[in-house]
Amino acid sequence: MKVYSGSDIRNVAVVGHSHCGKTSLISAMLHAAKMTPALGRVADGSAVTAYDDEEVARQTTMANAVAFAEWNGVKVNLVDTPGFHMFVHEARAAMMPVESALVVVNACSGVETMTDRVWKYATEVALPRAIVVNQVDHPKADSRLGRQQMIEMMQQRWGRQVVPIELPIVDDKGFHGVVDLVTMKAYMYQLDGSGRGEAGKIPHALEADSQAAHEALVELVAEGKDELMEEFFREGTIPEDHLITALHEAIREDRIFPVLYTSGLRNVGTDHLLDFLKVYAPAPAEREPIAARATRSTPPAHSNGEAKPGDGYVNEEMVMRRMDDKEPLALYVYKTMSDPFAGKISFFKVVSGVVKNDMTVENFTRHESERLSHLSVMQGRKPAEIQELHAGDLGAVPKLRSTLSGDTLGDRAHEIFLEPVSAPEPVMTYAIEPKSRGDEDKLAPALHKLMEEDSMVRFFRDPQTNEFLVAGSGQTHIEAIVSKLKKRYHTEVTLKAPKVPYRETIRGRAEAQGRHKKQTGGHGQFGDCKIRMEPLPRGSGIVFENDIFGGAIPRQFVPAVEKGIHESAGRGYLAGYPVVDFKVTVFDGSYHDVDSSEMSFKLAARIAFRKCMEQAKPALLEPVMRVEIESPDEFAGALMADLNSRRGRVQGMDTAGTGTVLRAEVPMAEMLNYGTTLTSITQGRGSFRMDMDHYDVVPQHLSEKILATAKKPAGEDGED
């Protein structure tokens, strides 16, 4: 395997909406570069970057995958990304180790919801990008969305910087070539799947369109560049070598978003796309220096292993690190994968320096040493071992002990910490139960391995309901987790809707006496307290106040009263849910010199608490979620109607590109399976996020149903 310098590397994320043909396009590029003996197909599982069993079964990419093509002296690293909304966070993570992106657009559907989202991600990180209109060979491509209409749609969304650098050649043979608007040559394909075009003259029918498009491209490239503008107005054009240099610079600076045309399935235009990446895509060596924190003091202490911004920083000093072989070694781990044969594989970018096989490095995030044995580059799931990798390249290494995604590794003497890409919070949670005792023993280790490779997986125990919960980005995601547990780790589980963490409260004021007295042989038990309970605003918790004067209850027993109140509140009154948002004041009582004790006053407080609850208008509270829903405009009405049916309160509606963002407050009980409904309403083009916002009183008719099915706490505490 050849070793490449940073100037001869192109790192490219391939992003776009689900089913726009990203994986097929990468397979076609690899075949055109003769990296694979045949054209890989997603449908039969032969595509290089679609190797996971779940991905093949569902015919959709669910995690980032890496492949590379060696093309005319450069190495093109391609990061395939999911386009389905449940996994689109992976596309954001894929933008960290690359210098450019190919935004793939379906020739029939045009710009879709996730296309807009990944474009937004790329804009946020100022990532240079080109647009690839794929599946141009589809019979309905031209009739459903003509070429000019497609360009206008993209310009409307993303600005006039969107400009064709190619024109598709479509005639009675179908799509079988492209016109290069820089060199003004046509490239024709035999449609044999080889992906190799032959240069020739532009077809007569496209001469006028090609000339007009060439002039529009030249004018946009020259815009804002005085020397080029003068040359353009003086000569009427710009020499080809000047145009290539200027176009490369314009793409790197996000002043132009060029449009190319391909067919991944028939392998048309892919060799020209590789040529484009070689000539115009930024190399790692051209990247601006990367900002990094100088150091950190302690490793993060989080159960899911995530590095959190701000954890353990010694200071906020920032350093700039150039992507250069001469800089100290630094590696950023952008992906972790669990392989049934190799174990855990860590995918990394060489941010600076040169990494060599069998080198020992420091994990700056966790303050542990790691040995880099079997240094490799990945072709899908297959590693190709290599002796060294230079600044800017992408590599992988198996069996690192402590390293997780988001970690920074490198030369111990030059510690830096690169900010990890934060994952969004999961939006769907299920209770998970092992089917057998053997499954129970294997469940936690298996889920923790899945959490290592997927930042959206969460596994935890609910402290209120005591259930084990698994959380993910949607129904499909959680189903995939369960399938992986069974197939990969031989662990079978049952999914159930999680219990809603209801709470209880009071809406009125009450006073009560709790008197605990028990006489047995020897010392007896005696405790007597009077308390007052009153409601507090939502979110106040429990407030305890001591208003005892004159020693009615000795000072040493007052904490026992408070403890008894807290214990009773934790057990609930109506249905065993914790009681919150109230103030309790102990204002009187009595004691016995011999028989009183902490336990006696704790039991007395429990009795007083239950009496007060009975009189203070107890009520059931439910968690209310803050929900944000993104979808195309045409689904806004149906989504609002659905939210209203779920007792939701719409708080506002905003515009996001050509889509709509709905903001609402909805009870958690109504949102447990919302992901499935949203997919149905929006035809898979919507997404949502939700976070806990506040608790509110459950309507009476629903409260009665909930209480009727809930298990009530048994027995009284103490004696009156």
What are the functions of these language-model segments?
Residues 1-720:
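Structural and coupling elements of P-loop NTPases
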